[in-house]
């Protein structure tokens, strides 16, 4: 999760709603019940017609404690552990079952680095961006996507270098070669620094550099 614009006004608004209303959490709905998503609702035995993304979740901490929510979630986990696919998100949705305040997409703005994207649109619309799927901005495969710049810009500003995490050596090397041959290195702000870190990471036994 990366904050790209000042969210203060919206966060205050969300917590004001949580305080006034009888809800514990506020989230973005990811799936509504339809013929394509009904498996999720049936698997988790949900009665509601909406399933939220837990990547960005606002919590009324006082209500959470008062209602002993943590302990109840652990009990829910034990009851549905054989049905879980999306880990904590499934447990949370099974427990709250649609009982949450809706937040807009710009507060939990989904990005999938598998696909090209308009970073200007993201800068204009998003408050928090959420890197979904297995394509994370710290992997060699994904750094060539312009969308990874929101994460890597923070690393360059704070560490003065790209932040890369080791995955599988042959895959890292494959994507490094492919993206170089297709000139995607032109998307990089500091290509020499990236290649130095990437090669060190690929040929090192360390998990990250």
Annotate each predicted stretch with a short phrase.
Residues 1-3, 27-38, 76-80, 102-108:
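Short linear motifs at secondary-structure transitions and domain/linker junctions
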Residues 1-12, 45-48, 79-83:
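N-terminal short leaders/motifs
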Residues 6-10, 36-41, 83-85, 108-114:
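Short amphipathic alpha-helical surface micro-motifs
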Residues 18-19, 49-51:
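Solvent-exposed alpha-helices and their adjacent loops that cap or buttress functional pockets
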Residues 20-45, 135, 147-151, 174:
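A short, conserved beta-to-alpha structural element at the edge of catalytic cores
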């Amino acid at each position: 999760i990366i904050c790209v614009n000042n969210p203060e006004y919206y966060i205050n608004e969300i917590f004001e709603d949580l305080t006034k209303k009888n809800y514990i959490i506020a989230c973005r709905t990811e799936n509504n019940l339809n013929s394509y998503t009904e498996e999720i609702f049936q698997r988790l035995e949900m009665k509601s017609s909406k399933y939220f993304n837990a990547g960005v979740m606002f919590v009324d901490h006082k209500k959470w404690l008062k209602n002993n929510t943590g302990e109840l979630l652990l009990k829910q986990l034990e009851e549905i552990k054989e049905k879980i696919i999306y880990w904590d998100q499934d447990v949370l949705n099974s427990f709250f079952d649609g009982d949450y305040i809706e937040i807009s997409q710009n507060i939990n703005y989904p990005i999938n680095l598998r696909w090209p994207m308009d970073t200007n649109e993201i800068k204009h619309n998003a408050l928090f961006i959420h890197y979904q799927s297995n394509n994370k901005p710290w992997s060699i495969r994904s750094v060539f996507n312009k969308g990874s710049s929101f994460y890597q810009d923070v690393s360059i500003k704070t560490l003065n270098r790209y932040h890369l995490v080791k995955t599988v050596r042959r895959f890292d090397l494959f994507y490094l070669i492919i993206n170089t041959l297709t000139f995607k290195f032109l998307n990089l702000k500091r290509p020499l620094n990236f290649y130095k870190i990437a090669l060190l990471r690929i040929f090192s036994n360390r998990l990250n550099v």
